[in-house]
Amino acid sequence: MVFVRRPWPALTTVLLALLVCLGALVDAYPIKPEAPREDASPEELNRYYASLRHYLNLVTRQRYGKRDGPDTLLSKTFFPDGEDRPVRSRSEGPDLW
């Protein structure tokens, strides 16, 4: 008897793992603060504006430093040692004979 393996259990497992990963990403994003009522007290407004400022600072965080372009990414991938090390020829290395 020939046993035919169906791919649906593996596909279901992969989809469930993907949903778990996406759920973790959604939970990591900060929640926008709720706006206070129209007749809110000044303390509530101050808390709202402080939490809104904190939210905007998190969402629009400045990125400092040089961004890597595609050429830099390729050079880091193929040459992980960097350009700090001088290139030596084989004649300068130890004799292997």
UniProtKB/Swiss-Prot annotation:
Segments of skewed composition (Basic and acidic residues): 82-97
**Gene Ontology terms: cellular component:** extracellular region; extracellular space
Q: Would I find Cytoplasm among this entry's keywords?
A: no
Q: Which UniProt keywords apply?
A: Amidation, Cleavage on pair of basic residues, Hormone, Phosphoprotein, Secreted, Signal
Mind listing the GO biological process terms from this record?
feeding behavior; intestinal epithelial cell differentiation; neuropeptide signaling pathway
**Top-rank lineage group of the source organism:** Eukaryota
The modified positions for Tyrosine amide read Y64
According to UniProt, residues marked as the site described as Cleavage are P30, I31
Record note on modification: The peptide YY form is cleaved at Pro-30 by the prolyl endopeptidase FAP (seprase) activity (in vitro) to generate peptide YY(3-36).
Primary role:
This gut peptide inhibits exocrine pancreatic secretion, has a vasoconstrictory action and inhibitis jejunal and colonic mobility.
Q: Say which family it is in.
A: Belongs to the NPY family.
**Identification of the protein by name:** Peptide YY
Q: What organism is listed for this UniProt entry?
A: Homo sapiens (Human)
